[in-house]
Regions:
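Conserved "landmark" site that anchors the functional core of diverse proteins
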Residues: 1-167
Length: 167
């Protein structure tokens, strides 16, 4: 919906419209959009900052340089981005912690990273992620994502968290 709004109200001829993943594929010289998807799913993203976009939004980059996708940001920025959107801008990945403007190229959507009631399994902080965390994505269909997002918002779902050492 954000891309359609952007095309209607801001810049209908932008090179990343109507498909951000196709745009990422082209500027990274990949053979298919499946290649983009596989790189995102195979990557382990290292969180080195929070709040880049709003409310606990992680700023992260893949640990393995072969998983780094590089892309431009929207110019001008979108006036609306859905909460939980996952995007890449430059070589960084971000998850939008709230609805608002934005410019990262969309690669997906995930569970909320900000919860006013806190995440009980993480010490009741309102943000899901911390500096030095690693993020791995798992592909789910739209219906499963809706159920996971609702369960997470209600405090009934907790993402898998494990301790690992960086080498």
């Amino acid at each position: 919906m954000a891309i359609q709004r952007y095309m209607k109200n801001v810049r209908p001829d932008a090179p990343w419209c109507p498909d951000n993943i196709e745009f990422i594929r082209r500027i990274n010289g990949l053979d298919s959009v499946e290649d983009v998807k596989q790189i995102v799913l195979d990557a382990s993203y290292f969180v080195f900052g929070l709040g880049d976009v709003y409310l606990g939004a992680p700023l992260a980059t893949p640990l393995d340089p072969t998983h780094r996708l590089v892309t431009t940001k929207y110019n001008p920025a979108r006036t609306w981005t859905a909460e939980g959107s996952v995007g890449i801008g430059g070589s960084y990945m971000c998850i939008y912690g709230m609805e608002g403007p934005g410019g990262y190229q969309f690669v997906g959507r995930t569970i909320p990273v900000w919860r006013n009631k806190g995440f009980a399994h993480l010490g009741d902080e309102p943000w899901l992620l911390r500096n030095y965390d690693q993020i791995r994505y798992v592909e789910v269909d739209a219906q499963e994502l809706l159920l996971l997002r609702e369960a997470c918002s209600n405090g009934e779902y907790f993402p898998q968290v494990e301790s690992v050492e960086l080498d």
